[in-house]
Each structure stands twice: as C-alpha cells, then as structure tokens.
C-alpha cells in the first residue's frame, strides 16, 4: 500500500511521496501578491502582532443531493436534466466524455449549491448509460455518497503579521497561507487566489504581501464553497484587528471605522474604489445596536468583510441574454445561467419589467438550457445578477427601440434581442498603477451579541452594502442564510476525517443549526442608491 498524505505538513515535506506521479511535488497552486513594502512598514510600526490561524473543512449541506436524468430525445440527442451550477459546462464535459456533440442539457430547479455543485458528479454517468443503452437513466446520489463525493470548504493554515501606528491605522500586513485541496485540484487554484487577493481586508493601506500554497493530499477534495477562500483569510485579518484594538486601547468598532476604505481611496490591491463603496455606511448602520449592547454589558463580536462580484483578475467574464418574442405574444427570457436558489429568474424578470414598458404578464422566464440559451458562465462568484443582469438590460434597450417605433408585441413575434456584457478586469500582477481586480465589490459589517449569562448568541446584525438591491426581500434572505451558515462554520460544524483520509460524519451529525436553535437575525440591506441622490452608475 502506498503511503498516504494526511495533511499540509506531510504534503510539503522534503522527499514527500507524491499524490500524482506525473507532478514534481504536491503543490497544486502557488500565489504571491505584493504591493508596497509590507516588511519595512511593519518593522517601523509601533504595534506589531503575529498569530497563527487555522480553519476546518466544512460541508455545504445543501438539501438536494446530486441528480441527473437523461434520455434520447426526438432529435436523437442525449438530453440531460441536471441540477448543477452551469448547464453549458456540463454540456462541454459530457461532449468530451462521450466523443459526440449530440448532447443537450437543461437545468432543473436546483435544491441548493453554495459551490458544491460546480464540479460534475453524476451527469456524465447518466449520459454515458443513456448513450450506450439508448434508454432513460436517472442517477441520484444518496446522502452518504454526496457527502463523500463533492468538494468541501478548504482547510487553511495561516500565519499573519499586522503592524499599526499609535492610532490604530494599519501600516502593513504580511501573511503566508497554506491550503489542503485534497486528492483532486477541483477549484483549489482559484480559491487560493481569491483568498490571497482579499486577505488584506476592506481597508485603506498600501503595504501588503502574501504567499499562498495549495497542496494535494489524500483527503477528500476541496473546492468552491460560499466565500471561495475569502472567509478563511478574512477570519485571520479580522481577528488581528480585534487584538490590535485591545492593545492600542480603542474599540473594535473604532479601529475598523478609522481604517475603512472610503470612496476615492485605494485598496491594498491597488484598485481605486468608487462612490458606490459603502463599508462606512455598514459600520454606521450597526453602531446603534453595538452601543446598546455595550451599555447593557453584553459581550459583542464585530467583523467587516469585502467580497468580489464577478470572476475578475483578467479572466474573461461574460453574461449573455436572449429575449425572444414568442407566438404567444410574450417575451421569453433565455439565459444560460443556472438558477440555484438565489432568485436569478426573479431578478431578470424584474429587470425586464423595470426597464421596458412591458407588464409582468408579458414576460416568461425560461430555465437555462444549452440549445437556445446563450452561455452565461457558472452561477458562482456572486456574478449573475451583476454580469448577466447587465446583459439583460442591454437586450432590453434593443427591444425598446422597436417598442418606441410603435410596434406591438404581436408585430414583434419571432424577433430576437441579444444582450452581452463583458466585465473587463486586469490580471494579477498587471503593470498598471491602479489595476482593476474586480468590476464590483460587496462590503459588510457583522455584529454578534451574546447573552451575558449563557454565552450563547442572542442577536446577529448583518449590514450589507449590496450596490443596487434589485429585490430587497431576496437580499435579506441571502443575508440571513449566510449568517446561519457562518454561525455553523464558526461555532460547531465539523467534517472530521479518519487516519485513512476518509470522512466519518453523517448529515445529521455535521453540527448544522436547527431552526429552533437560531438567534434573532437582523438583515440590513445598505443600498447607497437610496442614500445618496445621484445618477445611477451603469457598467
């Protein structure tokens, strides 16, 4: 039996056995990001704190296990109903596996994903069986199989050093991070990259350096999971800020308010933030709750975060929408973007009705497919409302040209209106003074209030700068879900692995919060378009 690689230390050891013989070592990915002189500024800082941090694996725990149904359709093609995060990606991979382009994919309603359904799992098995037998096939994983197969949130080990002046102003941060990406790459490289690009936090300082290494081990694979690596490095940065506030003698709220990025300032990655940046507003929104809790003597926890929208870092990121006026006299919305529970269909319909003279009854949202709907990339990276939404607006503008000319929907039957938006960004290391890493960021401040007698979480307040809230109720739902998931991650969820690198937990023992165990959650949607009176910014 070959020796197993159980952890990051074994994977990175000299002369370690290789998980893949064709690789020279166990390094899946390496990233180095540097701006300014972090080491120099830290050496001159009045206050310096260094700490080691670790975060565990966690399971997505989506309600619906992976499932695919396939059959031969009337055109002789292998037709796949799939619950995944990109119908077009499934199409490409199944075509490669079968050696034919006679494949169609349509998304069924997806019972949750959170990144756990980005990798193909059962679709190709169903497609292959149908291709060989010419019979309908359904492949659905049991819960135990699902827990074993799909990638998890990465285990991280991190060493961070932060330097601040006497007023708590950050002068520099230097870090090294190591991730266990398991026995397959999955999205280990992109997750590491996102962790590194966001590790500096949403603050105004210019001296930052980070090295990141993702290692192959024989553990279950790790990949995309809500936050995509940002949650891990955010935990380290925010923990250091709390320690720094204690050392300097100011409150956790005050140290964040002093350092918070503001419009026109420059993030540690060099990107200049615009007027839509609302981190300060999220801090101000939770301040009354914070002050009230402190006055009552209740223990509180506070944290800020930023997260990209869109793929960014120079990678092509395109949204596409096709509007077709059908024989029924209605406008049908076709987009290749999977709707996995975040409400994309609702958002596109809202955008359609809000930016045309049509009523809700005039519009039909069609599920993502690969033969009519144009490819809009994966439903991941908080990108679909922004990227595909902008494509929808552009298609609406073309449709309205015909409407303004006096045409009725009956006269427009059969017409197709196509919208496309490419989010242009700069690659990592671009030789420009102020690279655009991402077309947009979201900012948030979270406040946790404990019961001073029991130590249990009593109240969570989450203030999120979301840009334009297309559907505020849906935004609140996403915030509440994120809070619950993060509470489990921070407090009690676990995904232990035995000495043979095999997971040993069942769904019921993962440590998920039950509904009756949850605290009060207040979701504050910070929409700066409603706070500042200004012309809306179009992409």
Task: Name these PLM-found stretches.
Residues 1-464, 496:
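Structural alpha/beta core scaffold segments of enzyme domains
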Residues 473, 477-509:
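Active-site "cap" helix and flanking loop/linker of ATP-utilizing ligase/carboxylase catalytic domains
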Residues 529-539:
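Residue-level detector of conserved catalytic or cofactor/ligand-binding positions
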Residues 364, 514-530:
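Generic long, charged, amphipathic alpha-helical segments
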Residues 38-39, 292, 496-517:
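Contiguous domain-boundary segments centered on the initiation and propagation of an alpha-helix
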Residues 467-471:
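Cytochrome P450 core scaffold surrounding the K-helix E-X-X-R motif
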């Amino acid at each position: 039996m070959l020796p197993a690689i159980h952890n990051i230390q074994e994977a990175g050891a000299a002369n370690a056995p290789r998980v893949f013989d064709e690789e020279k070592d166990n390094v899946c990915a390496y990233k180095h990001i540097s701006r300014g002189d972090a080491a120099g500024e830290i050496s001159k800082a009045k206050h310096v704190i260094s700490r080691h941090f670790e975060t565990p694996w966690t399971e997505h725990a989506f309600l619906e296990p992976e499932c695919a149904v396939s059959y031969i359709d009337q055109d002789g093609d292998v037709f796949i109903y799939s619950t995944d995060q990109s119908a077009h990606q499934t199409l490409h991979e199944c075509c490669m596996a079968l050696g034919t382009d006679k494949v169609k994919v349509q998304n069924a309603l997806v019972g949750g994903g959170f990144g756990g359904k980005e990798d193909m799992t059962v679709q190709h098995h169903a497609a292959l069986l149908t291709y060989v037998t010419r019979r309908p096939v359904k492949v659905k994983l049991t819960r135990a199989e699902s827990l074993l197969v799909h990638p998890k949130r990465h285990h991280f080990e991190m060493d961070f050093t932060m330097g601040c002046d006497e007023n708590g102003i950050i002068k520099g941060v230097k870090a090294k991070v190591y991730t266990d990406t398991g026995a397959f790459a999955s999205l280990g490289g992109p997750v590491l990259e996102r962790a590194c690009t966001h590790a500096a936090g949403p603050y105004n300082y210019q001296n930052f350096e980070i090295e990141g290494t993702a290692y192959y081990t024989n553990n279950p694979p790790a990949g995309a999971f809500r936050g995509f690596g940002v949650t891990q490095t955010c935990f380290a940065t925010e923990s250091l800020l709390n320690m720094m506030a204690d050392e300097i003698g100011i409150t956790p709220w005050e140290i964040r308010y002093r350092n918070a990025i503001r419009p026109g300032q420059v993030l540690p990655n060099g990107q200049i933030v615009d007027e839509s940046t609302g981190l300060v507003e999220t801090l101000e929104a939770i301040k009354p709750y914070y002050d009230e809790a402190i006055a009552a003597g209740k223990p509180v926890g506070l944290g800020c975060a930023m997260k990209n929208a869109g793929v960014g870092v120079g990678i092509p990121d395109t949204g596409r929408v096709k509007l077709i006026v059908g024989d029924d006299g209605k406008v049908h919305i076709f987009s290749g973007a999977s709707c996995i529970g975040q409400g994309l269909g609702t958002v596109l319909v809202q955008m359609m009705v809000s930016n045309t003279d049509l009523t809700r009854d005039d519009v039909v949202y069609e599920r993502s497919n690969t033969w009519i709907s144009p490819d809009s990339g994966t439903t991941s990276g908080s990108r679909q409302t922004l990227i595909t939404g902008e494509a929808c607006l552009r298609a609406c503008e073309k449709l309205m040209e015909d409407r303004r000319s006096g045409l009725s929907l009956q006269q427009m039957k059969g017409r197709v209106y196509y919208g496309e938006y490419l989010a242009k960004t700069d690659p990592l290391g671009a030789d420009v003074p102020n690279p655009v890493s991402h077309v947009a960021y979201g900012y948030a401040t979270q406040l946790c209030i404990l019961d001073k007698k029991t130590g249990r979480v009593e109240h969570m307040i989450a203030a999120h700068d979301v840009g334009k809230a297309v559907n505020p109720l849906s935004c609140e739902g996403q915030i509440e879900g994120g809070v619950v998931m993060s509470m489990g991650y921070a407090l009690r969820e676990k995904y232990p692995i035995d000495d043979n690198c095999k997971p040993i937990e069942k769904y019921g023992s993962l440590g998920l919060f039950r509904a009756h165990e949850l605290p009060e959650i207040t979701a504050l949607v910070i929409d700066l378009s409603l706070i500042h009176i200004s012309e809306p910014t179009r992409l």
